[in-house]
Amino acid sequence: MSLSRSEEMHRLTENVYKTIMEQFNPSLRNFIAMGKNYEKALAGVTFAAKGYFDALVKMGELASESQGSKELGDVLFQMAEVHRQIQNQLEEMLKSFHNELLTQLEQKVELDSRYLSAALKKYQAEQRSKGDALDKCQAELKKLRKKSQGSKNPQKYSDKELQYIDAISNKQGELENYVSDGYKTALTEERRRFCFLVEKQCAVAKNSAAYHSKGKELLAQKLPVWQQACADPNKIPDRAVQLMQQIASSNGSILPSTLSASKSNLVISDPIPGAKPLPVPPELAPFVGRMSAQENVPVMNGVAGPDSEDYNPWADRKAAQPKSLSPPQSQSKLSDSYSNTLPVRKSVTPKNSYATTENKTLPRSSSMAAGLERNGRMRVKAIFSHAAGDNSTLLSFKEGDLITLLVPEARDGWHYGESEKTKMRGWFPFSYTRVLDSDGSDRLHMSLQQGKSSSTGNLLDKDDLAVPPPDYGTSSRAFPTQTAGTFKQRPYSVAVPAFSQGLDDYGARSVSSADVEVARF
């Protein structure tokens, strides 16, 4: 390698170092800044998405209150839950983007500036030292040749001249090798930086692929069920038809004005275990009064008529149905796919004897103003201890702990609530607790599951049974109403992660007061 080639390679080496320091690092800083803007924008999208699907949950609550659209309410709940899981995957991708890319690049670029500056100075100093040694040998050889030309005996300088030539050749070889190695080192440093960037970007891409794959998997699984649920908008569920027939059999005819009022103001919902009956609008009070006067129609917690089992959410259909009704639409698919963390819903046929017994035990009341949860959510007191174990969706508590119920009704004997002591949320067996009255005293809770057992039926026959106030017997089951701003507490809130179900890493946790306020709206 000639000296000119060595100098050219030296300039290339310096250019590589300067390119890294003057172009790569500033560009990397700009990339990090743009990445932070991107992260901030995605965080804003995530927050907006939570609000959007929170509103979707609210629409699902509204639909689930209706006898005609209850299945669609379950579908809306499933949609919100699926998209909540997708949003959780997006948040995981954002965490990876922040921790594995932006943070590490930001640390590297600060350390890299000082490291490259020191590496370039070291290379330049070593190259200059070797170049100076070569120049010195060449200068000595030049002087020696001048002496040899002016000497009468030039042969005596020949041996020394050969020594200088060998020294120059060795030093020039060392310089060329050093410059070559320096150029290789500079290219390696440049490549390492680009490889680091690509490696971190691949980690982000991997999480992005998992995010999209999770979304595709969930949506592909649920979408056909959702589409089937809304395939026939004109089909009225059997329970709504039976309700109309019950009204007709109780009064001789179906009142158009009553049905019209129920469409706009009246919401027909499933019974809430242990809760007071909902208030009835003034325009329906005379109508309900006439129904109360009929002694031949048994009442069970506000459900009038012989077909009261048809409105029980734990029973699919009564064995003897009018033949004119269309075949009952199975709801087991929607119930089973509602959440993979809920206990499996079973179909149990209630006994009419219990309904009659409870009707006799709990007399009706003329007061229709005893609304559900007038002073807030229902509270229960633990009468037994319960351990969740490894299941993060269950709630642990000890005897005597107070629990605030966060959903309106129990599902197969399981309720969802928040421990006032530990501030943890989760599902728990409702039979382990007693419902607290508004004054804070506890009373015996009688769930639908207990109402179906013979042991509880025998308990009702005892004289020393504490009977609730007369308002509990109000026959408002067929005519409950709620204002437009009143909804059931959502079982799957997108805005409150403590309600989440289905992700292993999203279990019960301590909830801040701000989360509680959001959940309460």
Swiss-Prot record:
Enumerate the residue ranges of region (Disordered): 299-370, 445-480
Q: Where is the composition biased (Low complexity)?
A: 321-335
Q: Give start and end of each SH3 domain.
A: 375-438
Q: Does the keyword Disulfide bond apply?
A: no
Q: Could you tell me which SUPFAM superfamilies the record lists for this protein?
A: BAR/IMD domain-like, SH3-domain
Q: What InterPro entries has UniProt attached to this entry? A: AH/BAR_dom_sf, BAIP2_I-BAR_dom, BAIP2_SH3, I-BAR_dom, IRSp53/IRTKS/Pinkbar, SH3-like_dom_sf, SH3_domain
For this entry, the protein name equals BAR/IMD domain-containing adapter protein 2
Q: Which organism is it from?
A: Cricetulus griseus (Chinese hamster)
The organism's taxonomic lineage, starting at the top? Eukaryota, Metazoa, Chordata, Craniata, Vertebrata
